[in-house]
């Protein structure tokens, strides 16, 4: 500004020779005084405006020439023409001051408007450049973020590849596990077959033991019968002995009577004495026979005692074998249950791993698709950014070239203006010398001229003092959401909020994969003893019995007269060994009779063929599979019904019968009223053996829920949809068995 004021002071000493003011007489000076003043003021104003505009243009153009657009070329040409016209007008102002005052004013106004337009264009260019800078910064930030994202994507892809390799390794390991499990299952099947074979052998041994026990019981009954027969024979012998004693007494009486009549019966005395001797011999024989019978009785008692002891030993052995077999069966059942739980766990683990692998593959496919989409988008963005960067580089190169051209032209224009200013200073000095010779007389005031045009808006004044703080305005509308910033550090845990209101019940989800089975529960109490089994196969032939004691040999009697034929004598001593005789008859007949006895038919237990008996009921375990209604009709055709399980013992027996088989229908349903389970005859359920989490009435999103119950692999109850196909169990009352069959 100081330079501008100095230039104005220098301009005030202008000369006016070039503008048509010539020296003359004093009168002409007076006449032309007003015109000279007006022309001088006009020249000062024009020069000041020109210097100000040139200085402002130079300052603005030098400051903001980096962001000049293509439209500056046309404006520059017009400005060059206008500057040339201004120079020519300045050169011709001395001759054409009066004529072209209005034209200069109009040109100045147009020049001002052009300068304002140029300022606006420069402001727009600066705004565009600032926007372009912001866009460049944003593009650079986006490029950096894209680079970071690409690195993150590479890391995620590496992690995914590592996960895929680990999944493949785990799959290989699971394949090894599956092969090992298959081998284990084959080994288990072999063990099961061996256990079944050993179980069959044990059953055969038990049947043989039962047969031997039955034979021993029959032998004991026969021995008891023989003992009873011997006791009867002894009673008969005692009765005979008493009769003989009575006879002997009668004989004594007769002898007394005969002694009285000895004289008359002397002929008969010899006979009577012979008869007495014979009677004495018979009595001695009877005494000997009684002693032999007592020895035989002693032998029989010893044999019976030995048999009783052997029976007791056999019963103890039988009880021990039964206990051992029961313990073995319980151990086998526990092992079977453990094997079943292990197999179920393995199946559940395999299903869980398969489900997990499916989810992993789906997630990997989703990640792959998202990665491909993001990569394609990023490649498109990068191509667009590269194109925009190329365009920006070309624009910047063209702007720099235009800036260089404008600088060179400004330098030339400033040089021309400096030359013009030097010439004007010289003219001003000359005019000052000429003005010293002028005598200016003040003439009468002229008429008031017309109102001039409104001047241009002045520069803004200095900023005033800061005013008082105004009232707080209304909150403005929320601005657009900014870009998402980086994730900040994790803040401290907030206070626990109040308990929210209970939400509405959501829809029932899909049926999940079977959970892992729980630990094995404690063994239950031993059940009551079962009913007696069927008669087994006949056992082997028993050993021969003990040999009886040999009787005592009687003394030879005195030969008497030949009497009546007496009783058979006691067997004598064994004679010498003779030649071998023909083969004798076979051994004891009772075991043979037992061996040849036919096995009882299946109707002996009161159940038809292919039906099994338990307590007073008969059960049919189907081989075919039907839906619930068809199974119910099948049982009704057999004059029975689907099984009703009303006790723990019945449940355990049915569990043993269905071990290792598929699911079976039972006569339990809630089709009449949901969640109210009843047997088919309408009776409520007293005993329950539902699986954990059942019944769940799972509908799987189609049709009705699960309204029919059945047994699963572990013997527990589960609800099924009634249109599923399963095996079934029929139940009916056992028919009365005739006593003749028993």
UniProtKB/Swiss-Prot annotation:
<feature type="binding site">
    <location>
        <position position="691"/>
    </location>
    <ligand>
        <name>a carbohydrate</name>
    </ligand>
</feature>
<keyword id="KW-1133">Transmembrane helix</keyword>
<dbReference type="GO" id="GO:0071360">
    <property type="term" value="P:cellular response to exogenous dsRNA"/>
</dbReference>
<dbReference type="GO" id="GO:0034138">
    <property type="term" value="P:toll-like receptor 3 signaling pathway"/>
</dbReference>
<feature type="binding site">
    <location>
        <position position="694"/>
    </location>
    <ligand>
        <name>Ca(2+) 3</name>
    </ligand>
</feature>
<feature type="compositionally biased region" description="Pro residues">
    <location>
        <begin position="516"/>
        <end position="532"/>
    </location>
</feature>
<dbReference type="InterPro" id="IPR050111">
    <property type="entry name" value="C-type_lectin/snaclec_domain"/>
</dbReference>
<dbReference type="GO" id="GO:0044857">
    <property type="term" value="P:plasma membrane raft organization"/>
</dbReference>
<feature type="binding site">
    <location>
        <position position="670"/>
    </location>
    <ligand>
        <name>Ca(2+) 2</name>
    </ligand>
</feature>
<feature type="transmembrane region" description="Helical; Signal-anchor for type II membrane protein">
    <location>
        <begin position="38"/>
        <end position="58"/>
    </location>
</feature>
<feature type="compositionally biased region" description="Pro residues">
    <location>
        <begin position="571"/>
        <end position="585"/>
    </location>
</feature>
<feature type="domain" description="Collagen-like 1">
    <location>
        <begin position="452"/>
        <end position="511"/>
    </location>
</feature>
<feature type="binding site">
    <location>
        <position position="718"/>
    </location>
    <ligand>
        <name>Ca(2+) 3</name>
    </ligand>
</feature>
<protein>
    <recommendedName>
        <fullName>Collectin-12</fullName>
    </recommendedName>
</protein>
<keyword id="KW-0479">Metal-binding</keyword>
<feature type="compositionally biased region" description="Low complexity">
    <location>
        <begin position="534"/>
        <end position="556"/>
    </location>
</feature>
<feature type="glycosylation site" description="N-linked (GlcNAc...) asparagine">
    <location>
        <position position="271"/>
    </location>
</feature>
<feature type="binding site">
    <location>
        <position position="707"/>
    </location>
    <ligand>
        <name>Ca(2+) 2</name>
    </ligand>
</feature>
<dbReference type="GO" id="GO:0016020">
    <property type="term" value="C:membrane"/>
</dbReference>
<feature type="binding site">
    <location>
        <position position="706"/>
    </location>
    <ligand>
        <name>Ca(2+) 3</name>
    </ligand>
</feature>
<feature type="disulfide bond">
    <location>
        <begin position="708"/>
        <end position="722"/>
    </location>
</feature>
<keyword id="KW-0677">Repeat</keyword>
<keyword id="KW-1015">Disulfide bond</keyword>
<feature type="glycosylation site" description="N-linked (GlcNAc...) asparagine">
    <location>
        <position position="159"/>
    </location>
</feature>
<feature type="domain" description="C-type lectin">
    <location>
        <begin position="614"/>
        <end position="731"/>
    </location>
</feature>
<dbReference type="InterPro" id="IPR033989">
    <property type="entry name" value="CD209-like_CTLD"/>
</dbReference>
<dbReference type="InterPro" id="IPR001304">
    <property type="entry name" value="C-type_lectin-like"/>
</dbReference>
<dbReference type="GO" id="GO:0006910">
    <property type="term" value="P:phagocytosis, recognition"/>
</dbReference>
<feature type="binding site">
    <location>
        <position position="719"/>
    </location>
    <ligand>
        <name>Ca(2+) 3</name>
    </ligand>
</feature>
<dbReference type="InterPro" id="IPR016186">
    <property type="entry name" value="C-type_lectin-like/link_sf"/>
</dbReference>
<feature type="binding site">
    <location>
        <position position="650"/>
    </location>
    <ligand>
        <name>Ca(2+) 1</name>
    </ligand>
</feature>
<keyword id="KW-0430">Lectin</keyword>
<comment type="function">
    <text>Scavenger receptor that displays several functions associated with host defense. Promotes binding and phagocytosis of Gram-positive, Gram-negative bacteria and yeast. Mediates the recognition, internalization and degradation of oxidatively modified low density lipoprotein (oxLDL) by vascular endothelial cells. Binds to several carbohydrates including Gal-type ligands, D-galactose, L- and D-fucose, GalNAc, T and Tn antigens in a calcium-dependent manner and internalizes specifically GalNAc in nurse-like cells. Also binds to sialyl Lewis X or a trisaccharide and asialo-orosomucoid (ASOR).</text>
</comment>
<dbReference type="GO" id="GO:0046872">
    <property type="term" value="F:metal ion binding"/>
</dbReference>
<keyword id="KW-0675">Receptor</keyword>
<feature type="binding site">
    <location>
        <position position="644"/>
    </location>
    <ligand>
        <name>Ca(2+) 1</name>
    </ligand>
</feature>
<dbReference type="GO" id="GO:0042742">
    <property type="term" value="P:defense response to bacterium"/>
</dbReference>
<feature type="domain" description="Collagen-like 2">
    <location>
        <begin position="527"/>
        <end position="586"/>
    </location>
</feature>
<feature type="region of interest" description="Disordered">
    <location>
        <begin position="439"/>
        <end position="608"/>
    </location>
</feature>
<dbReference type="GO" id="GO:0038023">
    <property type="term" value="F:signaling receptor activity"/>
</dbReference>
<keyword id="KW-0175">Coiled coil</keyword>
<feature type="coiled-coil region">
    <location>
        <begin position="220"/>
        <end position="301"/>
    </location>
</feature>
């Amino acid at each position: 500004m100081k330079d501008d004021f100095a230039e104005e002071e220098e301009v005030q000493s202008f000369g006016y020779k070039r503008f048509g003011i010539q020296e003359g007489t004093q009168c002409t000076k007076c006449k032309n005084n007003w015109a000279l003043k007006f022309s001088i003021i006009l020249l000062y104003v024009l020069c000041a405006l020109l210097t100000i505009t040139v200085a402002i243009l130079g300052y603005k153009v030098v400051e903001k020439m980096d962001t000049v657009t293509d439209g500056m070329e046309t404006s520059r040409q017009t400005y060059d023409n206008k500057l040339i016209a201004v120079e020519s007008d300045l050169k011709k102002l001395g001759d054409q001051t009066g004529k072209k005052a209005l034209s200069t004013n109009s040109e100045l106004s147009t020049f001002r408007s052009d300068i304002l337009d140029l300022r606006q264009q420069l402001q727009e260019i600066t705004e565009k450049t600032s926007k372009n800078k912001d866009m460049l910064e944003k593009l650079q930030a986006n490029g950096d973020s894209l680079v970071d994202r690409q690195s993150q994507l590479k890391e995620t892809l590496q992690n995914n590849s590592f996960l895929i390799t680990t999944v493949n390794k785990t799959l290989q390991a699971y394949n090894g596990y599956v092969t090992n499990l298959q081998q284990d299952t084959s080994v288990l099947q072999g063990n099961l077959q061996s256990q079944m074979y050993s179980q069959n052998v044990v059953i055969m041994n038990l049947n043989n033991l039962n047969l031997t026990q039955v034979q021993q019981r029959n032998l004991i009954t026969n021995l008891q019968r023989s003992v009873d027969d011997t006791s009867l024979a002894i009673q008969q012998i005692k009765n005979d002995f008493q009769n003989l004693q009575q006879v002997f007494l009668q004989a004594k009486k007769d002898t007394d009577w005969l002694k009285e009549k000895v004289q008359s019966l002397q002929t008969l005395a010899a006979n009577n004495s012979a008869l007495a001797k014979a009677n004495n011999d018979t009595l001695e024989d009877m005494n000997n026979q009684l002693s032999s019978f007592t020895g035989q009785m002693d032998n029989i008692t010893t044999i019976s005692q030995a048999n009783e002891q052997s029976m007791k030993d056999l019963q103890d052995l039988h009880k021990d074998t039964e206990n051992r077999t029961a313990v073995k069966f319980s151990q086998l059942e526990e092992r079977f249950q453990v094997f079943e739980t292990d197999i179920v766990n393995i199946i559940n683990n395999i299903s869980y791993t398969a489900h997990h692998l499916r989810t992993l593959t789906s997630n990997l496919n989703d990640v792959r698709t998202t990665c491909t989409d993001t990569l394609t988008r990023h490649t498109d963005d990068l191509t667009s950014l590269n194109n925009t960067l190329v365009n920006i580089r070309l624009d910047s190169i063209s702007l720099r070239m235009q800036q260089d051209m404008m600088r060179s032209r400004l330098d030339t224009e400033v040089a021309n203006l400096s030359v013009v200013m030097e010439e004007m200073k010289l003219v001003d000095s000359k005019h000052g010398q000429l003005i010293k010779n002028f005598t200016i007389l003040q003439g009468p005031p002229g008429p008031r001229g017309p109102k001039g045009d409104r001047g241009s808006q002045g520069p803004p004044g200095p900023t005033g003092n800061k005013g008082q703080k105004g009232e707080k305005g209304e909150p403005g509308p929320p601005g657009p959401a900014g870009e998402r910033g980086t994730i900040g550090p994790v803040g401290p845990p907030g206070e626990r909020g109040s308990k929210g209101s209970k939400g509405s019940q959501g829809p029932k989800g899909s049926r999940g994969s079977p959970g892992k089975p729980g630990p094995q529960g404690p063994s239950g109490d031993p059940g009551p003893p079962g009913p007696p089994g069927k008669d087994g196969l006949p056992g082997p032939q028993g050993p021969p019995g003990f040999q009886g004691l040999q009787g005592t040999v009687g003394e030879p009697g005195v030969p008497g007269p030949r009497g009546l034929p007496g009783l058979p004598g006691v067997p004598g001593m064994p004679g010498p060994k003779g030649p071998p005789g023909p083969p004798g008859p076979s051994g004891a007949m009772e075991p043979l009779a037992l061996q040849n006895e036919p096995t009882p038919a299946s109707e002996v237990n009161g159940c038809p063929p292919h039906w099994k008996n338990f307590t007073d009921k008969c059960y049919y375990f189907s081989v075919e599979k039907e839906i619930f209604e068809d199974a119910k009709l099948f049982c009704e055709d057999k004059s029975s019904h689907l099984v009703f399980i009303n006790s723990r013992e019945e449940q355990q027996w049915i569990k043993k019968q269905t071990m290792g088989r598929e699911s079976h229908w039972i006569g339990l349903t809630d089709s009449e009223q949901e969640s109210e389970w009843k047997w088919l005859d309408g009776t409520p359920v007293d005993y329950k053996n539902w699986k954990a989490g059942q019944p769940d009435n799972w509908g799987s999103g189609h049709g009705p829920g699960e309204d029919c119950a059945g047994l699963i692999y572990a013997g527990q109850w589960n609800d099924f949809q009634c249109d599923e196909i399963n095996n079934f169990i029929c139940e009916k009352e056992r028919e009365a068995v005739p006593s003749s069959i028993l």
